[in-house]
């Protein structure tokens, strides 16, 4: 019995440390973007597929997420497109498109929300401790504008509230804004 407990303990430590090691890479990739000047620009553009991206000096909130995941080897452009192609009727129809579009679908926050929901990544809970580094959060900004950001591994100066890495219009920033707008989603996405 003692031997089984030792193996179980080692397995838990290895599993936990592997999960921890993955998250900081995503946060680091997002934080790296805060060092670059990026003009907030959601203009439709034709981009390559797979691994397509708009110019690195342009982007919106979703581009912070897409670029961070891409830096750790996960191409959300492909994953979202493949799921939309197979399940187009389960995605938002607000754009009135007849089929998926690899140029823009992955850059739309409602599509990312649906993708993460379908991937089983939604997290419940709303206290500061429920938000872990690398988690994704979506908000609804004034004017019904959806927004997305990545939870940082850093905390605000006056509380245990985590900072958020996002682009709300002035380029990628790491800021204390988790509760600044109504939260519409909380996700912890890992590729299966």
Language-model features: locations:
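Low-complexity, Gly/Ser/Thr/Pro-rich intrinsically disordered linker/tail segments
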Residues: 159-192
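Active-site-adjacent structural segments surrounding the nucleophilic cysteine of cysteine proteases
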Residues: 18-59
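Positively charged n-region of N-terminal signal peptides that target proteins for export
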Residues: 1-6
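Bacterial N-terminal signal peptides
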Residues: 7-15
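Acidic helix-start/capping segments at beta-turn-to-alpha-helix junctions
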Residues: 42-62, 75-100
């Amino acid at each position: 019995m003692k031997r089984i407990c030792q193996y179980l303990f080692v397995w838990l430590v290895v599993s936990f440390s592997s999960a921890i090691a993955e998250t900081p890479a995503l946060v680091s990739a997002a934080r790296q973007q805060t060092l670059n000047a990026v003009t907030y620009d959601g203009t439709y553009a034709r981009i390559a597929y797979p691994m397509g991206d708009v110019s690195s000096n342009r982007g919106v909130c979703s581009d912070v997420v897409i670029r961070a995941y891409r830096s750790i080897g996960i191409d959300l452009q492909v994953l979202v497109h493949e799921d939309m192609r197979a399940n187009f009727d389960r995605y938002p129809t607000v754009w009135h498109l007849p089929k998926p579009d690899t140029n823009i679908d992955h850059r739309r926050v409602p599509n990312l929300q649906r993708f993460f929901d379908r991937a089983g990544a939604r997290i419940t809970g709303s206290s500061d401790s429920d938000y872990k580094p690398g988690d994704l959060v979506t908000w609804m900004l004034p004017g019904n504008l959806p927004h997305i950001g990545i939870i940082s591994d850093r905390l605000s100066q006056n509380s245990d509230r985590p900072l958020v890495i996002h682009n709300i219009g002035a380029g990628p920033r790491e800021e204390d804004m988790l509760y600044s707008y109504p939260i519409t989603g909380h996700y912890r996405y890992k590729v299966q």
